[in-house]
């Protein structure tokens, strides 16, 4: 596994952050689920940024994807002045998690905000005196008062080729819809969902065997490598290119979709890969419901042993199933609120 080629070694500022970066990029698959806790105990404190560095805040969740973007931001040489996250997405956000561990190590506050646009949240954001805020996975829409706090505004990093696949599940829908290419986009934040002007975009092919986890890892690497350039564009006052939303698309969040109700084996296969590892697909298997991690498409004439589903275009062999949902609820089969 490779690390972002353009990253400055975090160990120059903090051996612990360098070790966390090494640990993260050894993962073959990234999760978007906001329950990440770092395996290494923070040691010491990070060295300060260079004098005169841009003061930047970060808003996101404790997930592999957000952590990669945060480390890329720190790598870019800015002065990290604070972190913000959104309460309610997962119980882990209220306790010790990847964001709180890094905030403690960097000596900056972590704001756990239930409603970012309310008065107390705005006061807390102003106290950070940030020049710029970067967002990577955040489930609240910022209004004008919040947007006006940092003098250089907010930038959002989104894992799709905007304006395509705006919304909370771009990786899922790109795989399900059999797209051949996606990417990472940096944009100005305006009031709206992934609707602001585009600052920077990088493209990435979708491989035939990709699931959401392998694709998320490569897009995270693209994002981490591009963060320095995006920050410099924001610093320079670049307005960005307006998105033509009429030429784009918006897709909603999804649950544990039932592949036994899919119209074809090809679609069911894409649903399984798209749902792994964040929102696993589900099916009836041996008279009970289960979550599906891995399948194999085979001809109907193939007599390979194991549970299978039949479709007009062939069969789907269920190679790996589990009894817990794997999403941020972490519930046994049949009890997750996202079951369909």
Model-derived features: positions:
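N-terminal beta1-alpha1 ligand-phosphate binding loop
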Residues: 56-73
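Short amphipathic alpha-helix with an adjacent loop that forms part of the alpha/beta core around
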Residues: 119-129
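Donor/substrate-binding cores of folate-linked one-carbon enzymes
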Residues: 9, 34-42, 132, 136-248
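Short internal beta-strands
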Residues: 81-88
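An anion-binding loop in the catalytic cleft
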Residues: 2-53, 84, 261-340
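N-terminal beta-loop-helix "entrance" segment that forms/cooperates
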Residues: 89-106
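Residues that mark the start of a beta-strand
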Residues: 53-55, 151
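Acyl-group handling in specialized metabolite and lipid biosynthesis
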Residues: 251-263
């Amino acid at each position: 596994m490779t690390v972002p080629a353009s990253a400055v070694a975090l160990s120059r500022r903090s051996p612990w952050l360098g070790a966390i970066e090494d640990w993260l990029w050894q993962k073959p698959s990234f999760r978007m689920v906001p329950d990440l806790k770092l395996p290494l105990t923070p040691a010491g404190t990070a060295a300060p940024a260079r004098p005169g560095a841009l003061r930047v805040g970060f808003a996101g969740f404790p997930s592999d994807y957000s952590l990669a973007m945060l480390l890329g931001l720190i790598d870019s040489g800015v002065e990290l002045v604070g972190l913000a996250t959104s309460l309610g997405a997962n119980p882990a956000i209220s306790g010790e998690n990847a964001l709180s561990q890094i905030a403690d190590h960097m000596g900056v506050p972590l704001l756990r905000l239930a409603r970012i646009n309310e008065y107390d949240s705005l006061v807390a954001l102003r106290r950070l005196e940030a020049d710029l805020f970067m967002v990577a996975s955040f489930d609240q829409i910022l209004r004008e008062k919040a947007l006006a706090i940092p003098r250089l505004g907010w930038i959002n990093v989104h894992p799709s080729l905007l304006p395509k696949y705006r919304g909370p599940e771009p990786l899922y829908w790109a795989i399900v819809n059999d797209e051949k290419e996606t990417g990472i986009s940096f944009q100005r934040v305006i009031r709206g969902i992934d609707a602001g002007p585009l600052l920077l975009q990088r493209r990435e092919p979708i491989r035939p065997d990709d699931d959401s986890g392998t694709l998320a890892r490569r897009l995270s690497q693209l994002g981490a490598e591009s963060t320095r350039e995006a920050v410099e564009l924001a610093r320079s006052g670049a307005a960005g290119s307006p998105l033509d939303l009429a030429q784009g698309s918006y897709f909603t969040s999804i649950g544990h979709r039932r592949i036994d109700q899919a119209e074809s084996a090809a679609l069911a296969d894409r649903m399984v890969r798209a749902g792994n590892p964040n929102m696993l697909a589900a099916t009836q298997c041996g008279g009970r419901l289960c979550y599906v991690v891995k399948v194999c498409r085979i001809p109907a004439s193939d007599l390979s042993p194991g549970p299978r589903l039949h479709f007009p275009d062939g069969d789907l062999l269920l190679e790996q199933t589990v009894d817990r949902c794997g999403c941020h609820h972490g519930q046994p089969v049949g009890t997750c609120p996202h079951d369909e």
